[in-house]
Amino acid sequence: MIACASCSHVLKILESATVMEVKMAEVNRPDVIAGRELTNTFDIDAINYYDLQIITHDFIKNVLLSSPCIHNQIPDTLIQLAENTCRKILLNLSNVLSDEELKEERIRVWEIHDSQASSYERNFTQLILGGLIDEEQFTDTLENCATVSDILLPTFFNVYKLCGEELCKKYLEFLVNHPTLRKYRIEHV
């Protein structure tokens, strides 16, 4: 049973992805391999809300929106939605946009997602939704039903479904090199 309303967001994300922790050892898809590499390199579950939002913002802005496969397949209205999401993430982190306003935007974008017929557009919109989680929802989700890994790792699956192995590898490279993740690097002895 869902312990809190915010858990439903994570459950929706997980619906479209495999249960990576159970299958990671036996699956050799590029998204699972990338997820395994990420969790072997960083303490993903230690990532805080602010850092996750910065990473999500930078991914949408610098990787997702610059990918050629996006511009060939995604309508301009969704590109604008992604750009708007980037602005809203930063406004929320600087306390200009309230958590309530971010929550309203998340509901609006979920409605767009649910009305889309194209799975390609739905995958793209689902990646955008990752940036529209407010801090209270993030905290509730972690306290009641998920880990940061449960939130972050399905992104690899959505990236893989959207543009294949090439973008999946770019996403991993982006994460491994992101300055925010340095402090979460696992020191292997």
Predicted features and spans:
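Structured binding/interaction patches within domain cores
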Residues: 2-189
